Amino acid sequence: MLTIADHQFESRLFTGTGKFATAQTMLDAVGASESQLVTLAVKRLDLNTGSDNILKPLIDSGVKLLPNTAGARNVKEALFAAHLSREMLGTNWIKLEIHPDPKYLMPDPIETLEAARILCEQGYVVLPYVHADPVLCRRLEEVGCAAVMPLGSPIGSNQGLASEPFLKIIIEQAKVPVIVDAGIGAPSQATHAMELGADAVLVNTAIASSRDPVTMGRCFAQAVNTGRQAYIAGLGAVSHQAHNTSPLTGFLND
């Protein structure tokens, strides 16, 4: 079981809700993935008009909703989105995203740390999306974040774990769950993230943009479970020289 703040999850695969061709495809893919935590952008919510046709089915399915501040460019905008999500959804959980550059969507470390500090003081369960920066992740942990979400590679790029050397350091040092977020483009990459010791992964584009999102959701569920079990079992050490699996003894020297 994975524990974040006051909540426990059996599944270590978290999913997003964007980029799916239809709302029904998204709901079916989330169900197939067995994900128990789903993130959605606050800016997509419109409870007054009921135009958001994904919210009620997600709530009815029993998954935990993690609103995110995607689109926020600074502390002020992120705080506004977080306050709005708490009012609209009745949750103090927030995925903190601040990326002022609309082209590459790189998270702003300075604004993110300040917003995280304020939100933690206000009683939020903060899960910040950040660069794979071990120093920044430690600072976020120190201000009270419930988990850290370092990127594998740029959002939606499907480039995999380009930041692997830094992810290893973060995983080694962190005292809160580490959720690899962004850039995971294939089930094999999710497996590898879990083999490194990540506590969970968040996947959206790789599922939503696949030819069959429902089947891909199922594949990612299996991949994450496989990676986690491999990590628990203990991977063999990597060596630069060969080692006999059946040592040669005696009879070849006769």
From Swiss-Prot:
Family of the protein in this entry: Belongs to the ThiG family.
GO cellular component, one term: cytoplasm
The entry's keywords: Cytoplasm, Schiff base, Thiamine biosynthesis, Transferase
A GO molecular-function descriptor: thiazole synthase activity
One biological process term in Gene Ontology: thiamine diphosphate biosynthetic process
Catalyses which reaction(s): [ThiS sulfur-carrier protein]-C-terminal-Gly-aminoethanethioate + 2-iminoacetate + 1-deoxy-D-xylulose 5-phosphate = [ThiS sulfur-carrier protein]-C-terminal Gly-Gly + 2-[(2R,5Z)-2-carboxy-4-methylthiazol-5(2H)-ylidene]ethyl phosphate + 2 H2O + H(+)
Name by which UniProt lists this protein: Thiazole synthase
Subcellular location: Cytoplasm
Protein's job: Catalyzes the rearrangement of 1-deoxy-D-xylulose 5-phosphate (DXP) to produce the thiazole phosphate moiety of thiamine. Sulfur is provided by the thiocarboxylate moiety of the carrier protein ThiS. In vitro, sulfur can be provided by H(2)S.
Gene3D superfamilies linked to this entry: Aldolase class I
InterPro entries with a match to the protein in the record: Aldolase_TIM, Thiazole_synthase_ThiG, ThiG
Subunit structure: Homotetramer. Forms heterodimers with either ThiH or ThiS.
Main subcellular location: cytoplasm
Enzyme class of the recorded protein, top EC level: transferase
Catalytic residue positions: 95 (schiff-base intermediate with dxp)
EC code: 2.8.1.10
